[in-house]
Amino acid sequence: MANVRKRRKKKNEHKALRLTFITLLMVFLFSCVAAAGVGLAMIKAAPPLDVDKVLNPSEPSVIYDDKNKLVDTVISDTYRTIVSYEDVPDNLKNAFISIEDERFFNHRGIDYKRVFGAFFRNISNKLKGKSALQGASTITQQLVRNTLLSQEVRIKRKVQEMYLSIQLEKKVSKEQILEAYMNTIPLGGSAYGIEAASKQYFGKSVKDLNLIESAFIAGLPQSPSTFYNAAMSQKNTERYINRTKLVLGKMREHNYISKEDFDKSMAYIDKNKIPLKTSNINISRLNYEWFSREIIKQVKKDLMNEYKISPTEADKTIMYGGLKIYGTMDKSLQDFSQNTLDNLDGILGINSKDYSGIIQPEASVSIVDYKTGNVKVLIGGRGKQPPLSFNRATEFYRAPGSTIKPLTVYGPAIDTKTSTAASSYNDAPVPEEIGKLYDKEPYNPKNSPNIYEGKMTLREALMKSKNVISVRIEHELGLKTGAEYGKKFGLTIDDSMDGTSMAALSLGQLSAKTGVSGTNTLGMAAAYGVFGNKGALSKPVVYKKVVDRTGKVLLENKYASSKVMSPEAAYILYDLLKGPVSYTPGATGMKANFGPMARGKTGTSNQSSDLWFAGLSPYYSAAVWIGKDDYSPFTNEFGRYIGSSDAALIWKLIMGEAHKNLEYKTIEKPAGVTEAYVCSKSGKIPSSSCPRDSIKLEYFIEGTIPGEICDYHTGIFNNNKDKDDDDDDKDKDKEDEEENKDEKNEDKKEAKDNTKNKDKDKKKDNDRKIDMDKKPDSSKRKRKMIKPQI
């Protein structure tokens, strides 16, 4: 019996093993079938094998303007020069094969031995806690990837790469594959292909490379950006030195070089390192350097973010991808603006070439359609400057001077209801008790010109750019609040330096030289658009979409904005900004007045290093900057500092051109904005003694109309007869409180009571009707005010 039980047990064990084996086999076979199915699906989704694109992949990307007309071609032969297989030194061919694909002439597109070796090494690395993965791509696979596929690190792309490599090997020779590979491979910086790399690193043609130089270039594909940066900066040079030695070792291992040549090369490197003669490739100038370069920069950045690819891969996509990039530039307006900046002899008194042949003073202009964020004009300098020149419209920080006031002082004060457009301030030197809060020595800025006029409203202070009143308002508002608004407007403000500086936040004297604070014309143009866009800051965009050569949309810029202030505050600021460009005595920007749609503000930094004008219309916002690249003072022929009126004049010329075929229109007034008459001296309800020319109609955010009567003059002015009964009750309470005061106050009470008898005193009222100097168009407005009753 015992033997029978043992036999049964053994039989059951065999049965279980067979069942387990069959199950595992079924799972394996099912997995293989599933994997094969997935693989076939991936292969079917692969792009067609276009041999011509593989062997001749240089299809240029192009840039269009806002009317879809071609304005620039991105790629040029100076990025890459084709070299035939016969003209490439054997050492360079052998170096690439040794380090990149040692069995290149033996496989048919895929090196299976290398694939399995890399697979097991990667598993081993994973078990050991190492993150580095080893690739197994052949030269054929790399060529297919660089010319037909994306750079995504995904299984699907890898399967397609292997499939297309096998197909390619069936149709072309090894020599053709190697030639195409060497002419397309990214090798750091702007060099694509071996000829461009030879000139970039050694200043010679590829046919003249020696053994060490060939080994250096063949080692670059592993990490072109890293080796390029090390070569150009001469820092961490051991990176490319060790890589070059590794290539030489591989060449010796595969008998491409003799032991003698290997030993001599290693000894030379140990003694002399690798003598480089680096230089930037002579890139051809684009038709629209300032605008098109910015488009290329933004497209590169967005490709990297959207598809998680490296800078080198993004460059390759732009230069060889045959992309169609639809820009936002208004070509005719860009041309007009550039021509205006290039011909300032009648405006600017200085036109020297002091800095490396660059004309001085320099200038920049940006124009934005703030409703969409589309940039229409972007000019970073005067004259035809070399390719990749410094773009002053986007790449620098300068102190904005008084153009900052609407952003960090007046706008925030009205938005937070700290002030109104009618708030009255004393145009007089800043009191010591305020000044000492902001400097070791009491901060005591001066007006420019150094004139003080006493009481005036916020509106008049902005029109005349009164520095001392800006400081007084910022003191009430608080530096922290001013800095927060500045950042929301897009200014770069360093908290440790300018975030606590009264001079920086109230007068725009930001620490631009440090490179950590300031703005540029694109930033300032976008910021001023807030006042016409219901308080929203539109993200500036220089292109609308990018389409690849198959018609697929790779990138699309959708409208994006952020709220900066209320629509009511933005509208009031928009109206306030008509003051500086008016022809009123004391207005600082009247030279910018191209017509009734003009709004804006001047700005001048310390010692006239920066001259600004920024403003807007119902159509566009724009900014103009003039200055010197070395931040030196801007003076006239008599050594006197020059003001910002020249920037205002340039702004007028360019914005006038932008609006020459546009109909007059206005900005819609929000429902939350109301109107009332005020005294322009006190900012309060006019009294019967307020001079006729001091009574002005003003805008207010609902609920902020002043309740006090002018104490600068005497008498009472009924500003709100048509308000509800609650307001009348408040007025009656005020009368009761003053009942026992002197005769003058009694007269005020009587005058106020008389306003309730409009029909009885109608003739008298008409006789004494106030003639407003700047009465706005009332045909479409409902005003919450009445005419004065005395």
From Swiss-Prot:
Residues 1-20 are cytoplasmic. GO terms for cellular component: plasma membrane. Residues 42-790 are extracellular. Residues 724-740 have a biased composition (Acidic residues). Residues 780-790 have a biased composition (Basic residues). It is found in: Cell membrane. Residues 741-779 have a biased composition (Basic and acidic residues). Its main location: membrane. Residues 363-656 are annotated as: Transpeptidase. The chain crosses the membrane at residues 21-41. It catalyses: [GlcNAc-(1->4)-Mur2Ac(oyl-L-Ala-gamma-D-Glu-L-Lys-D-Ala-D-Ala)](n)-di-trans,octa-cis-undecaprenyl diphosphate + beta-D-GlcNAc-(1->4)-Mur2Ac(oyl-L-Ala-gamma-D-Glu-L-Lys-D-Ala-D-Ala)-di-trans,octa-cis-undecaprenyl diphosphate = [GlcNAc-(1->4)-Mur2Ac(oyl-L-Ala-gamma-D-Glu-L-Lys-D-Ala-D-Ala)](n+1)-di-trans,octa-cis-undecaprenyl diphosphate + di-trans,octa-cis-undecaprenyl diphosphate + H(+); Preferential cleavage: (Ac)2-L-Lys-D-Ala-|-D-Ala. Also transpeptidation of peptidyl-alanyl moieties that are N-acyl substituents of D-alanine. One of its GO terms (biological process) is response to antibiotic. Pathway: Cell wall biogenesis; peptidoglycan biosynthesis. Residues 61-230 are annotated as: Transglycosylase. One of its GO terms (molecular function) is peptidoglycan glycosyltransferase activity. Residues 720-790 are annotated as: Disordered. It comes from the Bacteria. The active site is at E100 (proton donor), S402 (acyl-ester intermediate). Its EC number is 2.4.99.28, 3.4.16.4. Keywords: Antibiotic resistance, Carboxypeptidase, Cell membrane, Cell shape, Cell wall biogenesis/degradation, Glycosyltransferase, Hydrolase, Membrane, Multifunctional enzyme, Peptidoglycan synthesis, Protease, Signal-anchor, Transferase, Transmembrane, Transmembrane helix. It is a single-pass type II membrane protein. In the N-terminal section; belongs to the glycosyltransferase 51 family. PANTHER family: BINDING PROTEIN TRANSPEPTIDASE, PUTATIVE-RELATED, PEPTIDOGLYCAN GLYCOSYLTRANSFERASE. Cell wall formation. Synthesis of cross-linked peptidoglycan from the lipid intermediates. The enzyme has a penicillin-insensitive transglycosylase N-terminal domain (formation of linear glycan strands) and a penicillin-sensitive transpeptidase C-terminal domain (cross-linking of the peptide subunits). This is Penicillin-binding protein 1A. It comes from Clostridium tetani (strain Massachusetts / E88). The lineage of its organism: Bacteria, Bacillati, Bacillota, Clostridia, Eubacteriales.
